[in-house]
Amino acid sequence: MNKHFLLLFSLFYFIVEATSLKCVTCHLRTQSDHCRRGFGVCLAQKHEICMSLRIYFSGSLQLSYMVCQRFCKNLTYIFNNRTYTHKCCNSDFCNFRL
């Protein structure tokens, strides 16, 4: 009985793992397209999706930030002559392409 339970549990774990949303993480990506901090992949938890924040100055990308995020809203606003663009998506690695 315990062997069957362990086998079922293992299969369930791999199915859940295979279906988890994967997002790129980068806590500081520069305009030269290099991630300076926190590069990797996060597995979105319950109610999380992929998020990208990009900061522009005079129309030129200055830096970006990418993570798995629970509360995410597509939003663009201007503050101190910089444009902040939040984008949310829900397919694997989609925040890298935004």
Curated annotation (Swiss-Prot):
Localization per Swiss-Prot or TrEMBL: Secreted
Statement: the UniProt record of this protein carries the keyword Glycoprotein: no
Pfam families: UPAR_LY6 (PF00021)
Main location (coarse class): secreted
Disulfide bond among keywords: yes
Residues annotated as signal peptide: 1-20
Keywords: Disulfide bond, Secreted, Signal
Boundaries of every UPAR/Ly6 domain copy: 21-97
Family note: Belongs to the PATE family.
Protein name, entry field: Prostate and testis expressed protein 3
UniProt lineage: Eukaryota, Metazoa, Chordata, Craniata, Vertebrata
